[in-house]
Amino acid sequence: MNSAESVPALTRRTFISQAALGAAAVALAPQVRAAELPPPKLGIAILGLGGYASGQLAPALKLTQNVQITGVITGTPEKGRNWSQVFGFPEKAIYSYDTMARIADNPTIDLVYVVTPNALHREHVIAAAKAGKHVITEKPMGISVAECDAMIAACRAAKVKLSVGYRLHFDPYFAEVARLAKEKDVGPFQKLSGGFGFTLSQPQWRAEKKLAGGGPLMDLGIYSIQAAGIATGEAVPVAITAKEQPKKRPEFFKDVEETIEWMMEYADGTRADFITSYNGGINRFRGESDKGWVQIEPAFSYNGLQGDSSKGKISFEPAVNQQARQLDHIAQCVREGRESDVPGEMGRRDMIIVEAIYTSAAQGGKRIEIKV
């Protein structure tokens, strides 16, 4: 049999059918290739180029998969130009606080990360929301519950997502704390303890109430509140008792606390005892039950965390970048139109706790019941 006899006749119908299939395959090819490619990164503008933005967010943004920096908002033009050169966005995407409303006209900016002093968060979050941009605000969310309410309302009105820069939720050591709390042979924890503190040696805005809203509780104590939330499945305490310790440097901490300790009671009987200070080093979290325990020390640093538990040592290698994971998670949630794991409502909850701590301390350690 010759080769011609082995080839079936090509009728007009089969030709058209095969041609159509071929055309469909050609048309489908770009779609297949597109499906294989990762989605484009969302653009973020950093608002406030201080130490945290430069020292932590800038390195993190070189590691992110879902978001890239496409602009900055700063009161120092030279800082903006430096960021432009490092990250490759045009100088026209450098905005001042007075001109930031113009970000509404920049389609390359999807999110704004507010990294200014605490008392400025409300103003800047609302401005970003009015520009139609999703917002991340650094912790604490604000300096009062009322400010948190205003930010949440503004973002809802603008139909944008609001998240808080709570990095502990993106560290594997605290993911392990959450996991162990649910394990029957370790958790649930009935006693939580620890704290975060260091010596604040140089005058700065963190020791000024008008900018910080408070002292170490606002800056560092918020981490212990977050850790307690992680260890209790985000339970809210029912009551708080607090005491401010006598100041060793009253001339330095004129209108904010230097050291404060507090106890949180939960509906199930769990008790949490924490301390925070600008005059001494502590960096620890511990959870205990009658069956087991977990301890992270250091607990609240950007890296170098170490853990131990009744079930053995806790170690994660290689180390992760908390901020990069946080940014990628929030960007992915924005892309999918869902709330992040660290929404504005969580920041509001924590500010309710902070206000109760300050109220108790101001009233000589009175037990303050919490209503959310």
Regions found by a protein language model. Name each.
Residues 46, 96, 137, 162-164, ...:
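Hydrophobic residues in well-ordered beta-strands that form the structural core
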Residues 18-88:
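N-terminal Rossmann-like dinucleotide-binding module
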Residues 93-154:
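Beta-loop-alpha module in the N-terminal Rossmann-like domain of NAD(P)-dependent dehydrogenases
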Residues 2-23:
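N-terminal secretory signal peptides and thylakoid transit peptides that target proteins
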Residues 16-38, 111, 315, 332-372:
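C-terminal helix-rich "cap/oligomerization" subdomain common to oxidoreductases
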Residues 226-303, 324-339, 355-357:
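Contiguous beta-strand/loop segments that form the cofactor/metal-binding neighborhood of enzyme cores
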Residues 150-167, 190-192:
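Rossmann-fold dehydrogenase core element
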